[in-house]
Amino acid sequence: MSNHSDQIVKKYILNQSFVESSFFTKLSELKLEKYKLDSSYIAIHGFQTHPTKLNKFNDTPVLNLDQSSFDDTLNDSRINIPGELFNVNTIEEFKSLDKLKLLNTWGQNVYSEVTNATSFDYKLFNKFYILTYSDLKKYKFYYWVAYPTLSNTWTVESESQETDTTITQLVETELDNEYGQFFQYYGGKLHKSVQADKEHTFVFIDTCLSKDRKPSSQLKNYLYFIAYKGIKEIDLVTYRNNNLSFTQHLKLDAFTDSPKISGWERTNQGKLGPKLADLGSLINPLQLAEQAVELNLKLMKWRIAPDIDLEIIKKQKVLLLGAGTLGSYVARALLGWGVRSITFVDSGRISFSNPVRQPLFNFEDCFSDSGQGEYKALRAAENLKRVFPGVDAKGICLAVPMVGHPVTDEHKERENYETLVKLFEEHDVIFLLMDSRESRWLPTLIGAANEKIVINAALGFDSYLVMRHGVTNQKDRLGCYYCNDVVAPNDSLSDRTLDQMCTVTRPGGALMASSLAVELLVAILQHPERNLAPHDAETKFGNIPHQIRGFLHNFQQTKLFAPSYVHCSACSPRVITEFKQEGWEFVRKCLDDSQYLEDISGLTKVQQEAELAAKQLLEDLSLDDDVSNDIDEDSEWLS
């Protein structure tokens, strides 16, 4: 062993962290869905390269963190280092925290574990902490890793590059079996606990291969531990796998029972300070958009609506019948709620008056190769994908067969009917957003027969109606759009003036009706019975009315309930039964002659009875008039 004339204070290589982007991706996911506003300490773990696998590039001890750092199960093939994560909720808190005080608090935890240790368990001596702030909106993550170290000064009395081959062989055997980082050597064996009365030869397995033979700073807590046990002079063998192990004779310079705590990680410039991981430029833009859309929704669960079920909303397959003003606004609102599957059905083309009222269309959409506007359904789906590429949006050009409009091309209309039936089977929710009354009849009937969630939105000039349809097995069944009618819907589109052909409404009404329709759906989905929920049923997210009627002339809104009607032309048991039995044949008869529909539903009989009652009432009133006239004539003689 070569001696130095001057004693040298023992020096170390400071730990560095390597935090992969997957660590922050996992942290953001857990922050949103699990931790929320909870800033309690979270148990995590990092890992280091096994000493037998180090190479010349591993000149610094590195702690690795990735998405697996949050797992409960550990990878036994790696050296797992326990740690704790302290995630604060604001950047102001991150900046204003007293970092020295925080480090001292962590250091006291390490001090307690080290001084009470019964063995050289590396997990007790190497615990780390990480202070973080997650800016989930900008995908920026501020972090600062600390390795609390108990300061104690040792001087190198002498040093040699020669080591006892017996010790190195024992170390290599030990590493093949079970990882340990620090041992006491006596009696020809390596021991995992300290014995002050035995030979003071200790072995440290280094986690870096620095060229100047400075060991990792992980050694410092072990040295403090043996000093705490009263050992003041040792021979230390620092093992390295590249045949560059070395031996030093160390002497304790001074010992204090209240050690100074150090350990904040330095930046790449060698300065004390936190680091910033900006993942915004690294994440795929589509993935960024997906996460950003879900961000606002998941933030609801932090405080405002912790019990809301967002997943059931997201997985709904929604069919929009009508891709005009109502359809455009409903689609945008559904996107905002996280719905990912939307299908538009419409047969119309985009006209020059549409883009200002229908937000899914632009001026350029008013042109196509045929000289007409683009098809609304197709362009609505395309433009919705431009708003959010992650949506599964489809457009289908289809004219819904309408009651009271006789069949002129049976092959085409039957094909449209069959397509519509198939679409109902494939979707969970149907919105009726068309601009005529009779066009809603067939979808109402198919929805009732299939017991789907059907939501209807309709506009007047300065009023609107939003309602949900009842289902057949519902207690106190809710009525549908036609349950208040005593006649079947008929042709309302022919022989109209210009102001009747255009949808003449106050522009704001469409936004209000559309948003209420979507919010009504969300409320339904939060109820355990879904569309079986009664009128004004309560959920953790509010009430579920049957109907909402709004009036813009006095800015009033009313919740209403109307029960189903046994003779309804769209949802009565007799009509549904006939539809299930005959299918297209029944529909064709109704399209050709709305009187047939009235006969089947019983409305004809209701009308006849009403006429008889009215006739009887008139006769009764006429008789009363005759009697009163006689009394007036007799009164002249009695006066």
UniProtKB/Swiss-Prot annotation:
This is Ubiquitin-like modifier-activating enzyme ATG7. The GxGxxG motif is important for the function, possibly through binding with ATP. NCBIfam families: E1_like_apg7. The keyword Iron does not apply. Belongs to the ATG7 family. Keywords: Autophagy, Cytoplasm, Protein transport, Transport, Ubl conjugation pathway. SUPFAM superfamilies: Activating enzymes of the ubiquitin-like proteins (SSF69572). The gene is APG7. It comes from Candida albicans (strain SC5314 / ATCC MYA-2876) (Yeast).
